[in-house]
Amino acid sequence: MPSRRFWIWFSMPQKMALIFDHILPVPLAEQAAQNSVWRSRLEVHPGNHFAIIASSGRGKSTLVNIAYGIRHDYSGSYKIDGRAASGLSAIDWSLLRQSTYACVFQDLKLFPQLSALDNLKLKCDLGSSFSIQQATAMAERLGLAPYLDKPCGQLSMGQQQRLAVVRALCQPFQYLFLDEPTSHLDRANADLVIELVMEQAAAQHAAVMITGLDQDHRLPHSFQLLCV
């Protein structure tokens, strides 16, 4: 059970910094480059934009999963507003993910048996301040209107990626993590996704951390490239 101090901390609207200090995942200890994110200090503040562009197997998803609190098999220090991430309980992480962290996972983590619309409704019903009308409006911008009543498992991978992006945006956040969110999209749809992401992030003055295999989705110039 988290202390009352943690409950108050996660409930209060504030701008917190993330500090990755010489983080090194155990599986990558042998191959991490000296000039990479893994062997340096990285500070991320609301409003920052970072892009991690690298080939497969370099640890892009690992970094996202560490940041989001899914993986803990690393050396070094990861601090959230000065507090060690390793000391947070499951409930503490849950509170963070309700109001501070949003994420698009590489494997999307959608519910294939539910319709696309029900996937969005589920997110909106879980204490989110976003209405289903707002969610469907974003889905329509990404060309998903004709597919909202279809089971998610019947959608193409590109359609599922766009749905996962909309779902991630249906909550308050200060940090948005996107793990290869446009890998199955053509240029036009990728541009629509990035446009919506940046618009919503700007509205909340949020940081954006995005991973990709290449720079083909033409990220805005505000993004700083990082090496893993």
Give the ranges of each region predicted by the language model:
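Helix-to-loop junction immediately C-terminal to a conserved catalytic motif
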Residues: 68
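Conserved ABC ATPase "signature" region
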Residues: 132-147
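Hydrophobic anchor residue at the start of the ABC signature
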Residues: 165
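Conserved ABC ATPase signature
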Residues: 151-159
